[in-house]
Amino acid sequence: MQKYFNLEWKEIEMFEIKIKLTTESCCLIGNQTESFSVGGVDQSTTIDENGRPIIHGSAFKGALRNIVREQEKKEGQMEKTKEYVKCIINEILEKYRSEDIVKTEKIEKMILNLENKVNSKDLKAEYIFGMEGINGLPRIFCSDFRVIESKDKKIGDYFLIDTKNCIEEINGNILSNPRTYKVIKPGVEFEGVIRFYTPFPIAAKEAKELEDSMEKELRCALELFNNGIYGIGNSKSRGYGQIRVEFCND
């Protein structure tokens, strides 16, 4: 029986990292505009169905991917993650090279793409976040980060209204354009989960060793949020987006 491109593999959860996230500065997540009113805000951080702030998993995942991308440029960093990515790409190639899979033009192109990547010195650790054009690749999933509720806090206690000047040049003139933002206050606590799934279990001992090493490297990358260099959301150059992360399942 011939198999086609969209193979269905059962995903296996390799590890889970539960995270408590605390805002250290004001944070502006997403680009949620509110209905205009005199004295209203120009831009608001995203909110959930109950009106509380929310940090969408895609925003956190994108910020983490940026850290991994920056770290792997440094010698000796993210090496075990790269090794795991190489093992997985070889697993995918083995499956797609099998004789019972129809070699469509799309699959042939994908195989060539993977062969080039696995044999390249530029094999990237960030491929654990997914690879364009490749189905079934192991990847990181990130939940939304939701507020840790407190009986003492009302909806308004999570937000600040902040005004910053936006400098614009119009017809050779430098103009100051004040803009108002509804942002998350410093000190607001959120919780969320990162999970890593793979449809390709490799040899038990090798898999366990790589899993432990890769999780350790990912935790080290997450801890870099705490040094003040990396942040999340918009307007980081203006001081927004500073956070602190703690691991809840240590």
Language model regions located:
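A short, acidic, amphipathic alpha-helical segment used as a generic capping/interface helix at domain edges
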Residues: 175-177
